[in-house]
From Swiss-Prot:
Subunit-structure text: Homohexamer (dimer of homotrimers).
Alphabetical GO biological process terms: proteolysis
Catalytic activity reported: Release of an N-terminal amino acid, Xaa-|-Yaa-, in which Xaa is preferably Leu, but may be other amino acids including Pro although not Arg or Lys, and Yaa may be Pro. Amino acid amides and methyl esters are also readily hydrolyzed, but rates on arylamides are exceedingly low; Release of N-terminal proline from a peptide
Protein's name in the database: Putative leucine aminopeptidase 1
A single GO cellular-component term on record: cytoplasm
Length: 542
C-alpha cells in the first residue's frame, strides 16, 4: 500500500464581524498596496480605506505601523509581516497578527488567491496555531454586487490553506502534526452558498493531495496492482455513486488490447486495466463523459548521464530506445502515472460532490515499462483493440500505446466526450515550460468548456495546433502507423497518434501534462489536473 494519508482536517467558516472582535491564535489580514499610506507624517501607516486595520493599529498603540515600517511592508504581493502581541487583560482575543500583502488589488484569479492561502498556511504552521482567521483590510471594489467574486476568492484562499499545510512525510521516521483545525474568513460574506463553496474547496483540495501522494509514491510501493487497489478503495468509499471494474491481463487479451499489453510484457508486475464509473444519484443522465489517464507506474526507459551536453536524445542501447539526459531524473519516472492520479483524484472529489445529470468513466491502463527478454523490441508490430497496427520504432514512446487501447475502450462505452491526460512528451515541456500543460483537440466546443474549467481552477493550459500535415511522418511502410515521428513537433504528432483511436463522433481532447505534473523546486508532485477535471464535469452537469 502507498500509505496515502488523510489531508489536513480543517473546518472553515465565513463570518460577518469586525476583525478586531475575532478570538483565536492568529489573525491574518490581507492588505493591498492602497491600504498602506505613502505619507510619512501620518501617525498610522494605514489609509482610511483600511479603517478596521487602522482601528486595530490604534488599539495596539501603533505596533502594526511600527512593525510594517521596519520590515518595509507596502502591501506588495508576496510580502508579509507577523508579530506576537503582548498578553494582558483587556487586550484582543488573538495572540498574533500577520499582515499579508496581496498587491495593487485583492487578487481575483484562483491561482493568486490560492497562493495567498498558502502564505497564511506557512505562517500558521510556523506559529503552530490551532485557529486562524483570514480578514480583509478593506472591501475590494466590485464585491458588493459581485457575489461570485467573493465566493470564488474565499474558496481559493481556503484551498491554498489546505494545500499549504500538507507535507508528504510518509517515508520519514519523524512526523509533524498539523495543529491548525479552524479557519474563519472575515469580510468575504457568509450564508449557505458560501458554506457550500468552502465545503467544495475542501473536497477538491483534499483530492489534489490524494493525487499528489499517489505520484509521490515510489514505484516499489505503487505498483499497477496497488494503483488498482487505491482506485477500488475510492469506489468503496463512495459506493452510492461509484463502481470499480478491474481487468486483468487475461481479460485485456480477450479484448485484444495488444498495444497496451506489449508495453506491459517486460514487467514482473502484471498490468491492471482500471475502470471507475460515476453515476449520479437518481440515475438521470444527460451526458456521458470519459477521462482517460496514462498509468505508467514506472518507466525504466530513461538512462541518465551526467555532464552530457544535450538535453534529451534517443539512443539505441542493447536493442532498446532509451532517453538520455544531462540531469539525473530516472528516479522521477514514478511520475509517469500523473495522468491517472489526476483522474482518480477527480473521482474522489466527485464522489463527495455528487453532481447530477452526468455519468463519468475514469479509465487507466496501468502497467510498468521495463526492460527484459519478454519486452517489446524496436521494429515490433502490435495491434490495438480497434484493429489498427502500429510499428514500434521507439520503445520509449510507450504511453501512447497504452492510451490507444484505453481510448478505444472509452469509445465503446458510448460516451459523448473524452479527455485524456498524460505525461506524454518532453517536447511539450520544452515548448511550454514547467507549469503549463498543452492541449490538442479538433473540437472548438470542448476547448471552450475546458478553458472555462481551467480559468475557474487556476491551472494553466495552452492549446497547440493539431496539424494534420504532420501525420505524414507517422506513416509506416509495414503497418498502419509508427508510434513516433520526428522530434520536430513531437507533442503534436503524439496527439495525432492518439486521434487514430477515437471515434469521429466523440468530442476528444488530449492533455500533455509532462511539465506541470512535478514541482522541481519543491521536489514533489503538484496534483495537477484534478481541480480542472472537477470543474469540467460540473460544467457538463445539469
Amino acid at each position: 500500500m502507498p500509505n496515502v494519508v488523510d489531508p489536513p482536517q480543517i473546518s472553515f467558516a465565513a463570518k460577518d464581524m469586525d476583525l478586531t472582535e475575532w478570538e483565536g491564535d492568529i489573525l491574518a489580514v490581507l492588505v493591498t498596496e492602497t491600504d498602506v499610506s505613502k505619507a510619512t507624517s501620518s501617525s498610522s501607516r494605514f489609509t482610511n480605506a483600511a479603517a478596521a486595520l487602522a482601528k486595530l493599529d490604534g488599539e495596539l498603540g501603533g505596533l502594526l505601523s511600527e512593525a510594517s515600517a521596519e520590515e518595509e511592508f507596502a502591501g506588495r504581493a508576496g510580502q508579509s509581516v507577523a508579530l506576537r502581541l503582548p498578553t494582558a487583560p483587556g487586550l484582543h482575543g488573538f495572540k498574533r497578527v500577520c499582515l499579508v500583502g496581496v498587491g495593487n488589488n485583492m487578487p481575483s484569479s484562483a491561482a493568486a488567491c490560492r497562493s495567498t492561502g498558502e502564505t497564511i498556511a506557512a505562517v500558521a504552521k510556523s506559529a503552530q496555531a490551532r485557529s486562524a482567521a483570514v480578514a480583509l483590510a478593506s472591501p475590494p471594489p466590485g464585491w458588493v454586487q459581485g457575489e461570485d467574486l467573493r465566493l470564488n476568492a474565499a474558496a481559493a484562499v481556503a484551498s491554498g490553506v489546505v494545500l499549504g499545510l500538507h507535507e508528504d512525510r510518509r517515508y520519514k521516521s519523524d512526523s509533524k502534526k498539523v495543529h491548525l483545525k479552524q479557519v474563519d474568513l472575515i469580510g468575504f460574506g457568509s450564508g449557505q452558498e458560501m458554506g457550500r463553496k468552502l465545503q467544495y474547496a475542501n473536497h477538491v483540495s483534499s483530492a489534489v493531495i490524494f493525487a499528489k501522494e499517489l505520484v509521490n509514491s515510489p514505484a516499489n510501493v505503487l505498483t499497477p496492482a496497488v494503483l488498482a487497489e487505491e482506485a477500488s478503495n475510492i469506489a468503496s468509499s463512495y459506493s452510492d455513486v461509484l463502481t470499480a471494474t478491474i481487468l486483468d491481463e487475461e481479460k485485456c487479451r480477450e479484448l485484444k488490447m495488444g498495444s497496451y499489453l506489449a508495453v506491459a510484457a517486460a514487467s514482473a508486475n502484471p498490468p491492471h486495466f482500471i475502470h471507475l464509473c460515476y453515476k449520479p444519484p437518481g440515475g438521470n443522465v444527460k451526458r456521458k463523459l470519459a477521462i482517460v489517464g496514462k498509468g505508467l507506474t514506472f518507466d525504466r526507459f530513461y538512462l541518465s548521464l551526467d555532464n552530457l551536453l544535450i538535453v534529451t536524445k534517443f539512443v539505441c542501447i542493447g536493442g532498446y530506445n532509451i532517453k538520455i539526459g544531462a540531469v539525473t531524473t530516472i528516479e522521477l519516472m514514478k511520475k509517469d502515472m500523473g495522468g491517472s492520479a489526476a483522474l482518480f483524484g477527480a473521482a474522489k472529489a466527485l464522489g463527495q460532490i455528487k453532481p447530477p445529470g452526468v455519468e463519468v468513466h475514469f479509465i487507466s491502463a496501468a502497467c510498468e515499462n521495463m526492460i527484459s527478454g519478454t519486452g517489446m523490441r524496436p521494429g515490433d508490430i502490435v495491434t490495438a483493440s480497434n484493429g489498427k497496427t502500429i510499428e514500434v520504432d521507439n520503445t520509449d514512446a510507450e504511453g501512447r500505446l497504452t492510451l490507444a487501447d484505453a481510448l478505444v475502450y472509452a469509445c465503446k462505452l458510448g460516451v459523448d466526450k473524452i479527455i485524456d491526460l498524460a505525461t506524454l512528451t518532453g517536447y511539450c515541456r520544452i515548448a511550454l515550460g514547467p507549469s503549463i500543460a498543452g492541449i490538442l483537440t479538433p473540437s472548438d466546443e470542448l476547448d471552450k468548456e475546458v478553458a472555462a474549467a481551467y480559468e475557474a481552477s487556476g491551472e494553466k493550459f495552452w492549446r497547440l495546433p493539431l496539424e494534420e500535415s504532420y501525420w505524414e511522418q507517422m506513416k509506416s511502410s509495414v503497418a498502419d502507423m509508427l508510434n513516433t515521428g520526428s522530434p520536430l513537433g513531437g507533442a503534436i504528432t503524439a496527439g495525432l497518434f492518439l486521434k487514430q483511436f477515437v471515434d469521429e463522433k466523440v468530442k476528444w481532447m488530449h492533455v500533455d501534462m509532462a511539465g506541470p505534473v512535478w514541482n522541481y523546486k519543491k521536489q514533489e508532485a503538484t496534483g495537477f489536473g484534478v481541480s480542472t477535471l472537477v470543474e469540467w464535469v460540473l460544467i457538463n452537469s445539469s
